Amino acid sequence: MAYSQPSFALLCRNNQTGQEFNSGDTSFRVNVSPVVQYDKSISVLDLSQLVSCQNEDSTGQNYDYLKILKGSGFSPALDTKTYGRLDFTSRPTGYARQLPLQFDLQVTEAFYQYGVWKPFPAKLYLYPEPGVFGKVINNGDLLATLYVNKFSTKGQEAGERNFTWRFYATNDVHIQTGTCRVSSNNVKVDLPSYPGGPVTVPLTVRCDQTQSVSYTLSGPVTGSGNTVFANTAASGAGGVGVQLSDKAGPVPAGQPRSLGQVGSSPVSLGLKASYALTGQASLTPGAVQSVINVTFSYN
């Protein structure tokens, strides 16, 4: 006589794609629409919109539980500009822990209804470090990684499983804290044919209250001195990149540049864009394109 054993598995689903999984690594692509909360935190990920799970025990005798494990948190790149928080939204009084987690959470979420998809009730928040504004997240960046453990009332009979959920941004995210603002989140500068230039970069900043403001450039660089940003154009010109300069000269990547005291009147960064030789290859014809990030800080 043949018979089948009931399944004690927990099945989860990527709500965006419909992909189902019961363990292992899963990636989520998220269009991030940050919402500033009353406590100045920024809501980044609502897991209830992204992940659902269901109990697969048709007998109703086995409850599954999920808990989030040590090491879960935002990506290291975000940790340098912000700190994070995880909230379980199903708790009446709330349950919050700072990220990255330093220990496995004892709070669990139960899944006991057979065949019923239940959203995972948690949200991830960012708290920008004081003085940080500008672009914080780039399209394609890893936002956060959650390590999740599934266990059951039937113990090992029902199987213990581990998940790794990785969330990637599908858009750029800018933070405007309400204290200082930039004139544009995206500035396109068209250079004339080589060797023409330089061309003014129309970018200003202003603050609600007078602050000491500085900015830092970042992006792929080439050559010595970190002042020539790499040409990222497909089939682009060789031996040449883009350089941003102010009245003091070329601005290196990764080194803060002070704008002094900035108040309610817009202050220009005073930047000009020009071509610059990399010194690493012969000059060859082609397109030139560089993407340069500007991050502001104030105190």
From Swiss-Prot:
Any GO BP annotation: cell adhesion involved in single-species biofilm formation
InterPro entries recorded: Adhesion_dom_fimbrial, Adhesion_dom_fimbrial_sf, Adhesion_dom_sf, Bact_Fimbrial_Adh_Pro, FimH_man-bd
A UniProt-annotated Pfam family: FimH_man-bind
GO cellular component: pilus
Main location: other
Keyword annotations of the record: Fimbrium
CDD domains (UniProt xref): FimH_man-bind
Disruption phenotype annotation: Deletion decreases hemagglutination and fimbriation levels.
Locations listed in the record: Fimbrium
Database matches in Gene3D superfamilies: Fimbrial-type adhesion domain
Function (record text): Fimbriae (also called pili), polar filaments radiating from the surface of the bacterium to a length of 0.5-1.5 micrometers and numbering 100-300 per cell, enable bacteria to colonize the epithelium of specific host organs.
Family per similarity comment: Belongs to the fimbrial protein family.
Entry protein name: S-fimbrial protein subunit SfaH
Natural source organism: Escherichia coli O6:K15:H31 (strain 536 / UPEC)
Gene: sfaH
